[in-house]
């Protein structure tokens, strides 16, 4: 059984017991969360596709950890003009373990 849900402007395909990295959620570690923006649920041959959401579809998950991703560098450079600019960015994330999928 797997499902597709939407969180943080992105869509994620998950199954029960899987750990997923999402955009940062302001919820404490160890708490549970329910995602109700479920786009699709598949259980073998039984597939439910929402238009746009599956009615009654809920994905239950537990917050595992919060953290920051790897640093990326943004570089601006103009040749022959002695102009260089560097900026770094580390995106916050939340790791979530899927505990249940229901339709």
Curated annotation (Swiss-Prot):
<keyword id="KW-0699">rRNA-binding</keyword>
<dbReference type="GO" id="GO:0019843">
    <property type="term" value="F:rRNA binding"/>
</dbReference>
<dbReference type="InterPro" id="IPR001787">
    <property type="entry name" value="Ribosomal_bL21"/>
</dbReference>
<keyword id="KW-0694">RNA-binding</keyword>
<keyword id="KW-0687">Ribonucleoprotein</keyword>
<dbReference type="Pfam" id="PF00829">
    <property type="entry name" value="Ribosomal_L21p"/>
</dbReference>
<dbReference type="GO" id="GO:0005737">
    <property type="term" value="C:cytoplasm"/>
</dbReference>
<keyword id="KW-0689">Ribosomal protein</keyword>
<dbReference type="GO" id="GO:0005840">
    <property type="term" value="C:ribosome"/>
</dbReference>
<comment type="subunit">
    <text>Part of the 50S ribosomal subunit. Contacts protein L20.</text>
</comment>
<dbReference type="GO" id="GO:0003735">
    <property type="term" value="F:structural constituent of ribosome"/>
</dbReference>
<comment type="function">
    <text>This protein binds to 23S rRNA in the presence of protein L20.</text>
</comment>
<dbReference type="InterPro" id="IPR018258">
    <property type="entry name" value="Ribosomal_bL21_CS"/>
</dbReference>
<dbReference type="GO" id="GO:0006412">
    <property type="term" value="P:translation"/>
</dbReference>
<dbReference type="GO" id="GO:1990904">
    <property type="term" value="C:ribonucleoprotein complex"/>
</dbReference>
<comment type="similarity">
    <text>Belongs to the bacterial ribosomal protein bL21 family.</text>
</comment>
<protein>
    <recommendedName>
        <fullName>Large ribosomal subunit protein bL21</fullName>
    </recommendedName>
</protein>
<dbReference type="InterPro" id="IPR036164">
    <property type="entry name" value="bL21-like_sf"/>
</dbReference>
<dbReference type="InterPro" id="IPR028909">
    <property type="entry name" value="bL21-like"/>
</dbReference>
